[in-house]
């Protein structure tokens, strides 16, 4: 007995969907991480540095898996300023960035007033570290690293963190 054409097509479609599931999950993780970063910015208390009329610069590498998802927030407001994702290589100083998104292996720049450093993966020196695990994205907060850059976090953000250092 041979399978019907419908059953053959159904099995082929199911197999294709299952093969694509890990890629979809990866894409979803990247979008979630970008949304986390946008919300981190919303729940950060920034020092008054006279930048009220300037764009809210989010610096990252275009090679980062997060790049296009971070760009999807361009134009959205953060404390009355428009989010603008830019290539870190085009900034003369990392301190020009309101948020600096680093890959796990990227070198940490010197502290800069008003700059929130978020690292995607384990590492030291960032104020917020995104952590993958147990099918969830979690984050750790280093309040000392934030304080070095003149930043404070909302208690709401701190309550959601996996660890607060």
Please provide the spans of the model-predicted regions.
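Bacterial N-terminal signal peptides
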Residues: 9-19
